[in-house]
Amino acid sequence: LNDAVLEEWMISVEDQLEVVRRMRIAMPEMSFAVESNDHYHREIAYVPKWDIGMDNVGVEKIEDAIKRPALKILGRCSNHEFTSDEMVAVAHREVQDLVTVTHSTSRDSLIEISALNISKGTSLAMMAQRLGLTADDCVSFGDNPNDFSMLEWASRSYAMSDGHPEAPTFAKGVAEPCEADGVAKIIEQLLDLPA
Protein backbone atom coordinates (compact mmCIF):
# COMPACT_ATOMS: atom_id res chain seq x y z
CA LEU A 1 0.00 0.00 0.00
CA ASN A 2 1.05 3.59 -0.56
CA ASP A 3 -0.50 6.99 0.00
CA ALA A 4 -2.64 6.83 -3.15
CA VAL A 5 -6.31 7.65 -2.66
CA LEU A 6 -8.27 4.53 -3.55
CA GLU A 7 -11.75 5.97 -3.24
CA GLU A 8 -13.43 9.20 -2.18
CA TRP A 9 -16.98 9.77 -1.02
CA MET A 10 -17.74 13.39 -1.72
CA ILE A 11 -20.53 15.66 -0.56
CA SER A 12 -22.07 17.34 -3.59
CA VAL A 13 -22.16 21.12 -3.90
CA GLU A 14 -25.95 21.02 -3.57
CA ASP A 15 -25.84 18.94 -0.40
CA GLN A 16 -23.11 21.12 1.13
CA LEU A 17 -25.22 24.22 0.56
CA GLU A 18 -28.33 22.55 1.96
CA VAL A 19 -26.50 21.31 5.07
CA VAL A 20 -25.13 24.78 5.76
CA ARG A 21 -28.55 26.36 5.14
CA ARG A 22 -30.31 24.03 7.58
CA MET A 23 -27.62 24.29 10.23
CA ARG A 24 -27.55 28.11 10.09
CA ILE A 25 -31.25 28.05 11.00
CA ALA A 26 -30.93 25.36 13.69
CA MET A 27 -27.70 26.64 15.25
CA PRO A 28 -26.84 30.22 14.20
CA GLU A 29 -23.73 30.19 16.41
CA MET A 30 -22.05 27.62 14.14
CA SER A 31 -19.42 28.62 11.59
CA PHE A 32 -18.12 26.36 8.83
CA ALA A 33 -15.14 25.05 6.90
CA VAL A 34 -15.03 22.64 3.96
CA GLU A 35 -12.14 20.39 3.03
CA SER A 36 -10.95 17.88 0.51
CA ASN A 37 -7.57 16.40 -0.34
CA ASP A 38 -6.47 19.47 -2.25
CA HIS A 39 -8.54 22.35 -0.89
CA TYR A 40 -9.68 23.85 2.39
CA HIS A 41 -11.80 26.93 2.99
CA ARG A 42 -13.17 28.40 6.20
CA GLU A 43 -15.33 31.23 7.32
CA ILE A 44 -13.61 34.10 9.11
CA ALA A 45 -15.74 33.28 12.18
CA TYR A 46 -14.44 29.69 12.15
CA VAL A 47 -11.43 29.80 14.48
CA PRO A 48 -8.98 27.13 13.32
CA LYS A 49 -7.19 24.82 15.75
CA TRP A 50 -5.56 21.81 14.05
CA ASP A 51 -6.11 23.39 10.66
CA ILE A 52 -4.13 26.58 11.37
CA GLY A 53 -2.37 27.84 8.26
CA MET A 54 -4.58 26.01 5.77
CA ASP A 55 -6.69 29.11 5.05
CA ASN A 56 -5.31 32.24 6.66
CA VAL A 57 -7.84 34.58 5.05
CA GLY A 58 -11.26 32.97 5.23
CA VAL A 59 -14.51 34.08 3.65
CA GLU A 60 -17.49 35.85 5.21
CA LYS A 61 -19.87 33.02 4.30
CA ILE A 62 -18.74 29.51 3.39
CA GLU A 63 -21.38 29.44 0.67
CA ASP A 64 -19.07 31.75 -1.32
CA ALA A 65 -16.33 29.09 -1.27
CA ILE A 66 -18.46 26.02 -1.98
CA LYS A 67 -17.79 25.53 -5.68
CA ARG A 68 -17.04 21.79 -5.90
CA PRO A 69 -17.65 18.55 -4.00
CA ALA A 70 -15.93 18.19 -0.63
CA LEU A 71 -14.89 15.29 1.58
CA LYS A 72 -15.93 17.00 4.77
CA ILE A 73 -17.80 19.93 6.21
CA LEU A 74 -16.62 21.09 9.61
CA GLY A 75 -18.94 22.95 11.94
CA ARG A 76 -17.56 24.86 14.91
CA CYS A 77 -18.98 26.96 17.72
CA SER A 78 -15.82 29.00 18.25
CA ASN A 79 -17.08 30.48 21.52
CA HIS A 80 -18.02 27.02 22.87
CA GLU A 81 -21.72 27.85 23.13
CA PHE A 82 -22.47 24.12 22.71
CA THR A 83 -20.57 20.91 23.33
CA SER A 84 -19.68 18.64 20.44
CA ASP A 85 -22.29 16.13 21.68
CA GLU A 86 -24.99 18.83 21.67
CA MET A 87 -23.95 19.94 18.19
CA VAL A 88 -24.09 16.37 16.86
CA ALA A 89 -27.57 15.89 18.33
CA VAL A 90 -28.89 19.01 16.57
CA ALA A 91 -27.11 18.24 13.29
CA HIS A 92 -28.32 14.64 13.29
CA ARG A 93 -31.89 15.84 13.68
CA GLU A 94 -31.52 18.45 10.93
CA VAL A 95 -29.39 16.79 8.23
CA GLN A 96 -29.31 13.01 8.75
CA ASP A 97 -31.08 12.53 5.43
CA LEU A 98 -28.16 14.17 3.57
CA VAL A 99 -24.93 13.39 5.44
CA THR A 100 -23.24 11.53 8.29
CA VAL A 101 -22.45 13.63 11.38
CA THR A 102 -19.98 12.86 14.16
CA HIS A 103 -17.24 14.39 16.26
CA SER A 104 -13.71 13.44 17.23
CA THR A 105 -13.23 15.42 20.41
CA SER A 106 -15.33 16.22 23.43
CA ARG A 107 -12.93 19.01 24.40
CA ASP A 108 -13.81 21.26 21.48
CA SER A 109 -17.07 22.49 19.99
CA LEU A 110 -16.51 20.87 16.59
CA ILE A 111 -18.47 18.45 14.42
CA GLU A 112 -17.40 16.58 11.29
CA ILE A 113 -19.84 16.02 8.45
CA SER A 114 -19.16 13.45 5.72
CA ALA A 115 -21.07 11.88 2.86
CA LEU A 116 -24.22 9.93 3.73
CA ASN A 117 -23.52 6.50 5.25
CA ILE A 118 -19.75 7.02 5.24
CA SER A 119 -17.90 6.41 8.49
CA LYS A 120 -14.74 4.79 9.78
CA GLY A 121 -16.73 1.57 10.15
CA THR A 122 -18.00 1.48 6.57
CA SER A 123 -14.57 2.47 5.25
CA LEU A 124 -12.79 -0.20 7.29
CA ALA A 125 -15.29 -2.82 6.11
CA MET A 126 -14.70 -1.84 2.46
CA MET A 127 -10.93 -1.88 2.85
CA ALA A 128 -11.00 -5.21 4.66
CA GLN A 129 -13.11 -6.74 1.89
CA ARG A 130 -10.63 -5.53 -0.74
CA LEU A 131 -7.87 -7.29 1.18
CA GLY A 132 -9.88 -10.48 1.64
CA LEU A 133 -10.37 -9.88 5.36
CA THR A 134 -13.44 -9.99 7.58
CA ALA A 135 -14.37 -8.30 10.85
CA ASP A 136 -12.89 -11.33 12.63
CA ASP A 137 -9.46 -10.46 11.20
CA CYS A 138 -9.52 -6.85 12.39
CA VAL A 139 -8.71 -5.04 15.61
CA SER A 140 -9.77 -1.46 16.28
CA PHE A 141 -9.20 1.09 19.02
CA GLY A 142 -11.21 4.26 19.49
CA ASP A 143 -12.13 6.97 21.90
CA ASN A 144 -14.77 9.25 20.37
CA PRO A 145 -18.02 9.09 18.37
CA ASN A 146 -16.16 9.17 15.04
CA ASP A 147 -14.78 5.76 16.07
CA PHE A 148 -18.04 4.14 17.24
CA SER A 149 -18.94 2.55 13.88
CA MET A 150 -15.44 1.07 13.61
CA LEU A 151 -15.58 -0.26 17.18
CA GLU A 152 -18.96 -1.80 16.44
CA TRP A 153 -17.79 -3.42 13.18
CA ALA A 154 -14.48 -5.01 14.21
CA SER A 155 -14.76 -8.31 16.07
CA ARG A 156 -11.96 -7.24 18.40
CA SER A 157 -12.49 -3.64 19.36
CA TYR A 158 -11.38 -1.63 22.33
CA ALA A 159 -12.64 1.66 23.68
CA MET A 160 -10.00 3.79 25.34
CA SER A 161 -10.91 4.09 29.02
CA ASP A 162 -10.28 7.83 29.01
CA GLY A 163 -12.41 8.43 25.92
CA HIS A 164 -16.03 9.41 25.39
CA PRO A 165 -18.29 7.85 28.05
CA GLU A 166 -20.40 6.06 25.41
CA ALA A 167 -17.43 4.43 23.63
CA PRO A 168 -17.48 1.19 25.70
CA THR A 169 -21.06 0.48 24.60
CA PHE A 170 -19.82 0.11 21.00
CA ALA A 171 -16.65 -1.88 21.75
CA LYS A 172 -16.04 -5.47 22.77
CA GLY A 173 -13.47 -4.44 25.38
CA VAL A 174 -11.83 -1.49 27.10
CA ALA A 175 -8.15 -0.52 26.91
CA GLU A 176 -6.23 1.50 29.42
CA PRO A 177 -5.55 5.14 28.46
CA CYS A 178 -2.97 5.90 25.77
CA GLU A 179 -0.74 7.50 28.43
CA ALA A 180 -0.64 4.09 30.16
CA ASP A 181 0.26 2.31 26.88
CA GLY A 182 -3.24 0.88 26.63
CA VAL A 183 -3.03 0.10 22.90
CA ALA A 184 0.40 -1.51 23.25
CA LYS A 185 -0.78 -3.68 26.14
CA ILE A 186 -3.73 -5.02 24.14
CA ILE A 187 -1.53 -5.73 21.12
CA GLU A 188 0.94 -7.59 23.35
CA GLN A 189 -1.96 -9.69 24.70
CA LEU A 190 -3.32 -10.41 21.23
CA LEU A 191 0.11 -11.44 19.97
CA ASP A 192 0.79 -13.31 23.22
CA LEU A 193 3.96 -11.34 23.79
CA PRO A 194 5.67 -11.10 27.17
CA ALA A 195 4.88 -7.86 28.98
What are these regions (language model features)?
Residues 1-4, 67-69, 106-107, 152, ...:
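Short glycine-enriched loop/turn motifs at secondary-structure junctions
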Residues 1-17, 23:
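Glycine/small-residue-rich loop that forms an oxyanion/phosphate-binding "nest" at active or ligand-binding sites
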Residues 4, 9, 109-111, 191:
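Flexible, active-site-adjacent loop/turn segments at secondary-structure boundaries
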Residues 9-11, 52, 116-117, 152:
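Short, flexible loop segments at the rims of nucleotide/cofactor-binding pockets, characterized by
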Residues 11, 79, 175:
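Catalytic cores of large soluble enzymes that bind and process phosphate-bearing ligands
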Residues 22, 26-141, 145:
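Conserved acidic, metal-coordinating active-site core of Asp-based
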Residues 112-195:
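Mg2+-dependent phosphoryl-transfer enzymes with acidic/Ser/Thr/Gly-rich catalytic loops
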